[in-house]
């Protein structure tokens, strides 16, 4: 079962529809027991870093989604998308007083240039590491982005893909069984759907 984690951040139906092309065993949930029993997890989302972390940190029964996610990322394939990627870091300039999940060391910063913000539209992804999500996808293919902040991991070996928008920034991270994309694979045509298929097929 693939669990899409619902923390009131929107954009859940689009990733659910994309996953349904490859499996029907999907649930959208915030229930801790369901999340803990899942074979794979997806953390999507659009919105504000601080508001989202407050939702994730609220207790649901005996524990918070924050605690549940940090347990699960050690065991099963995990995919963070857009804001879901940024939440995996330790903190963000968008809401400096609110800690992130801390799964990956580093922070989230606002674009430091005069290019139009948000970075919105199609852009190429440079594959800097060979990871399972890239299988069947050529280098420098186009994916769809909508964001004003980007990740800045202190662990540079987790950077698997980069994109240039005024300067080069990380757009795909991979740490063990944790994967994260700044772009929206579910909105990125055939290449994005191939990436989702690759995630579904992970063991």
From Swiss-Prot:
One of its GO terms (cellular component) is cytoplasm. Pathway: Amino-acid biosynthesis; L-histidine biosynthesis; L-histidine from 5-phospho-alpha-D-ribose 1-diphosphate: step 5/9. SUPFAM superfamilies: Class I glutamine amidotransferase-like. Keywords: Amino-acid biosynthesis, Cytoplasm, Glutamine amidotransferase, Histidine biosynthesis, Hydrolase, Lyase. The keyword Cytoplasm applies. The active site is at residues 82, 184, 186. GO terms for biological process: L-histidine biosynthetic process. Residues 1-203 form the Glutamine amidotransferase type-1 domain. It catalyses: 5-[(5-phospho-1-deoxy-D-ribulos-1-ylimino)methylamino]-1-(5-phospho-beta-D-ribosyl)imidazole-4-carboxamide + L-glutamine = D-erythro-1-(imidazol-4-yl)glycerol 3-phosphate + 5-amino-1-(5-phospho-beta-D-ribosyl)imidazole-4-carboxamide + L-glutamate + H(+); L-glutamine + H2O = L-glutamate + NH4(+). CDD domains: GATase1_IGP_Synthase (cd01748). Its EC number is 4.3.2.10, 3.5.1.2. The keyword Nucleus does not apply. It is found in: Cytoplasm. GO terms for molecular function: glutaminase activity; imidazoleglycerol-phosphate synthase activity; lyase activity. Heterodimer of HisH and HisF. IGPS catalyzes the conversion of PRFAR and glutamine to IGP, AICAR and glutamate. The HisH subunit provides the glutamine amidotransferase activity that produces the ammonia necessary to HisF for the synthesis of IGP and AICAR. This is Imidazole glycerol phosphate synthase subunit HisH 1. The gene is hisH1.
């Amino acid at each position: 079962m693939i669990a899409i984690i619902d923390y009131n951040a929107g954009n859940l139906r689009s990733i659910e529809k994309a996953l349904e092309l490859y499996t029907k065993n999907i649930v959208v949930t915030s229930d801790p027991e369901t999340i803990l029993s899942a074979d794979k997890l997806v953390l999507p989302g659009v919105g504000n870093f601080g508001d989202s972390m407050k939702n994730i940190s609220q207790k649901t029964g005996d524990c918070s989604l924050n605690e549940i996610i940090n347990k699960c990322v050690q065991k099963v394939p995990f995919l963070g998308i857009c804001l879901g990627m940024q939440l995996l870091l330790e903190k963000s300039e968008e809401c400096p007083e609110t800690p992130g999940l801390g799964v990956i060391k580093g922070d989230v910063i606002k674009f430091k240039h005069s290019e139009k913000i948000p970075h919105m539209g199609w852009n190429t992804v440079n594959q800097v590491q060979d990871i399972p999500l890239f299988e069947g996808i050529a280098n420098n293919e186009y994916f769809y982005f909508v964001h004003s902040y980007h990740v800045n991991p202190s662990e540079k070996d987790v950077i698997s893909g980069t994109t240039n928008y005024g300067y080069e920034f990380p757009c795909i991270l991979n740490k063990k069984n944790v994967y994260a994309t700044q772009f929206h694979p579910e909105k990125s045509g055939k290449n994005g759907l191939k990436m989702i298929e690759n995630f579904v097929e992970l063991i």
